[in-house]
Every structure is written in structure tokens, then in C-alpha cells.
Amino acid sequence: MCGFLVWLYSLSMLPPMVVALFYKEKSLFVFFITFVIFFCIGGGAWYTTKKSGIQLRTRDGFIIIVMFWILFSVISAFPLWIDSELNLTFIDALFEGVSGITTTGATVIDDVSSLPRAYLYYRSQLNFIGGLGVIVLAVAVLPLLGIGGTKLYQSEMPGPFKDDKLTPRLADTSRTLWITYSLLGIACIVCYRLAGMPLFDAICHGISTVSLGGFSTHSESIGYFNNYLVELVAGSFSLLSAFNFTLWYIVISRKTIKPLIRDIELRFFLLIALGVIIVTSFQVWHIGMYDLHGSFIHSFFLASSMLTDNGLATQDYASWPTHTIVFLLLSSFFGGCIGSTCGGIKSLRFLILFKQSKHEINQLSHPRALLSVNVGGKIVTDRVMRSVWSFFFLYTLFTVFFILVLNGMGYDFLTSFATVAACINNMGLGFGATASSFGVLNDIAKCLMCIAMILGRLEIYPVIILFSGFFWRS
């Protein structure tokens, strides 16, 4: 299996090769070398182990999930590292690779606009591949080869209700999710093009927007285009991509939008999104940065981008009031819906925590009443409640830990907070010293933020469980 997935991932070097060939860029050779190396390594390993017939256990699923996200990050960094014209150290290339494949969108490259077009496309492609998860794509293919992947899929799908199955045929479900994801990307590309964005930029931004990755073809990000329609498209597709993709699957399979209307998590998420947009609009309008129309457009885009952990930005977001940026950074912890390409804690968990808090208040008011926590008409079990509280505690603990470590390295508190929020939430937008580039971080800080990005993307548990002594017992 390991060899097959490496071999499969090596094929992702072919599209950048086509782009480099079309634009007659020297990076063609770099991508070709990367393709050949990992095609041979992966193919050789697959050929020697494909008849082993080893059955995966739950423990193996967790190990493989973490191992492959690390492995794919290293492979993603390889072409960036070996190209001498980019002048990136291995740590810088690794940071860029991890940021791309985890859909974080943070970059150490100061002048993105100067990159060859093959690399601009490649970075957006990393976002797209990482968006729904390399494992989801693998699970759609592996069953056809007679390799069981159910345990991997259960480990990858986030959320307290992740054990629920969509259909009896996992491969069909995964394939439908991938097709839905691709169609959303195509729709975004078309809308960007209609809004006036050049075709190449539209393709790159389209696939990075629906993945909520945030890599751009310009150093100024979306602000480069100075176009209200482009910002509306980016904000709208950021919100759409924050929907639970299970809902998109049900909508397609049942040919009805009722699941979107009835889903309590989605309604809660949209309510929070509306509140964040309104508050942000009022703040920037109140201080006179823009007129009322401009305040709404810019706030709709940036609030949607940061709330959903997309990370695309307007050119002058760093000049916004500090309290507004801090408010948006805090909103990035909220994230979107469970089962989406968002980072963050996710809206369903916050909804459960809110319901639990309300339940405790009611219980204190009526000590003898037999009350329960209900979400969408269903009673939340103690097991789910423990899972949500445990996740919230661990997420907060790691966030505080990383902030204190960066602050101890000499970075000011705002820079430390913004950097950690950008990485662990897979949001990608820094502030303070990292507003324009994360290249200002030292190598140790970059490595720590790589860990934060992977922790955020895998939602902590698959990583930390590997350090549990109980996990390794027979």
C-alpha cells in the first residue's frame, strides 16, 4: 500500500510538467526528475509488496494516516528544494510543502509573483489535493485493487459522528465526494473568469479557493486584482466550501436541497458567518476606511476567508485596525462545518459546547429536572460530549503551548498568536512580523509550525495517539 500511494502521488507532478512545457520554463526538468524518482521508488515498493495480503487494523490506520501526510509533505517539498533558482533551504521547502498539502496557505516566499508559472500552479494544486484529503482519493481507488481502506477513511473524516457511514459502498461514496469537490472547483474557476480574472489566475485561484488553501499567484493575493466581483466570488465559494461535503453528497444523490436547509450545523455556521461579517463591516466603516459599500464587500471577503480558514486576503488587510484583525483571527478557530475542507475546531463542536453550557445553566436553575443536550432533535451521548470537550481542551492546550514557545523565542505576542492561529487552524494569514511572509521565522519555529499545521489538519488525535503507551500494547 505504501508503495502504491507514493507511486500514485508521483503522478501529481505531471500537470506542473505540462504547465512548464506550455510556458517553456526550466522547471520542467525539476518536476520530471521528481516524477521519475518517486514513480520508481513507489512502483518498486508496490510491486514487491502487492501480494502480501496484509489486513489493516485500526492501529495501522492511524499510523498510515500520519505517516503519509508527513511523507506527502516531504515529496511536495522536493521539487521546491532541488531547484537552485528558488534558493529555498530544505526547511523552507518543507514548510511550503506542508503548508500546501495541509491547505494552510502560509508561505515563506517573499515575492510569490516572481515564481515561474509551473510553481504557481503547483502550489495551488497542492491545496487542491490536500483539500478533501489524499486519503479520500486513495480510498476511492484502493478498494478497486482489493485493498481495504475503510479504517483509513474513518481516521481521516473529522468529527464526533465520523463513524456514521454514508452508503454501504465506501468507494462509491468517496468517488462522489471527489467528483462533487471537483465540480465545485470548476464552478469557481468559471465564476472567477466571468469576474474578469485571467484564465491562468482563475484556474489557480479556483482550485485553491474550494480547497480553502489560500495559495495565490500574486504576493498581494486577491487584493492584486482590485476587483469587487473577484472578492465576492472568493468570499462566496469560501462559504460554500465550508459546507459539510456529506451534505453535498446527499444533495446530489437525492437530487434535493432539503438536507442543506434542515442541517442544524449549517444553519449555525451561516448564522455565525453573518454575525462575523456584520461586525467586521461595522468596524471598518466606523473608522472611515471605506464607504458603506466598500466596507461590506471587503469585510464579506476577508471575514469569509478567515472564518473558513481559506487565507486569501486583500492587499491592505495588515493596515486594518488591530482589534478587527484579532477578532478575525479568533473567528478562524471556529472554522466551518465538520466534513468540509476547513481547519479550526468546527461549528458542530461549538454548537455542542454551546448547548452543553445552556444545559448546565438550565440544570442549575432546575436541579431536579431531567434534562438532556439535544442537537437537531438528537440527544448528544456522553461519549460524544467527552470527545468534544477533550478535543477542545487539547486544541486549546496545543495553541497556548505553541504561542508561548514562539513568544519565548523573542517574537512579540501578537505575531506569536497570529502565526499559531494561521498554522494550527490551517488558515495561513499571519499578522505582525509574519503579515507578508513566514520566512522571518527561524528554522526551529518553522518546524514547530509544520507540526502545528499537521496537527490541525489531522485534528490532533491521530497524531498524539501514536505517543500513547496504551496504543502500542497488543
Question: What is the role of each PLM region?
Answer:
Residues 1-474:
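Membrane-proximal intracellular helices of multi-pass ion channels
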